[in-house]
Structures are given as C-alpha cells and as structure tokens.
C-alpha cells in the first residue's frame, strides 16, 4: 500500500473526504518526524512505538576501491510493534 492508497483507505474507513484524510496523514508524518528529531518516542498503545535508535561510529570499506573509511554515528528511525498489532497480524 502506498501513501495515496492509505489516504483513500482512511477516507473510506473514517467517512472523511480524501482531502481531510490526506491532511491527517501529512500531519501525522510531520508530527512523528519532528518528535523523533527532538529525541522523543511516539507511542500508540497497542499499535507500537516509533523511536530513533543511535548507531555508533564504525569502520567500513568503500565497495568500489576497498579503501577503509569511517561511517559517522547517526540516528535511524525504528518501529517496535505493540502486542495488539502483533496479535491482529498473526490471527
């Protein structure tokens, strides 16, 4: 499912206009992104938690030349699914 299909599904499920559903999806993505940038987790009880995991600086290799290089530390967005979501997916 892509973004436009998600917007249509939300519009149908919540009996909203497609425009209102699009505004909701865009606002949700914007708020979650900003919270992760600020170092906060976003938890939807039963559904899951969005969080930013910190990876340490590490050594790597340039695949083209084989030269060693340093890969900088960075944050990576992650999602941990909640129990209710896991149960729903597994039947």
Swiss-Prot record:
Keyword S-adenosyl-L-methionine: no
Name of the protein this chain belongs to: DNA-binding protein HU-beta 2
Gene field: hupB2
Assigned protein family: Belongs to the bacterial histone-like protein family.
GO cellular component: cytosol
Source organism, top-level taxon: Bacteria
PANTHER family hit by this protein: DNA-BINDING PROTEIN HU, DNA-BINDING PROTEIN HU-BETA
Pfam families, alphabetized: Bac_DNA_binding
Alphabetic keyword roster: DNA condensation, DNA-binding
InterPro entries: Hist_DNA-bd, IHF-like_DNA-bd_dom_sf
Biological process terms in GO annotation: chromosome condensation
Record's keyword annotation contains ATP-binding: no
One of the record's GO molecular function terms: structural constituent of chromatin
Role summary: Histone-like DNA-binding protein which is capable of wrapping DNA to stabilize it, and thus to prevent its denaturation under extreme environmental conditions.
């Amino acid at each position: 499912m892509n973004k436009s299909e998600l917007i249509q599904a939300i519009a149908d499920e919540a009996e909203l206009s497609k425009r209102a559903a699009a505004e909701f999806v865009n606002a949700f993505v914007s708020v979650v992104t900003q919270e992760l940038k600020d170092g906060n987790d976003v938890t939807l009880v039963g559904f899951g938690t969005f969080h930013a995991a910190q990876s340490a600086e590490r050594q790597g290799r340039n695949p083209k030349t084989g030269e060693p290089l340093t890969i900088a530390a960075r944050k990576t967005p992650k999602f941990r699914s909640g129990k209710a979501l896991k149960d729903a997916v597994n039947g």
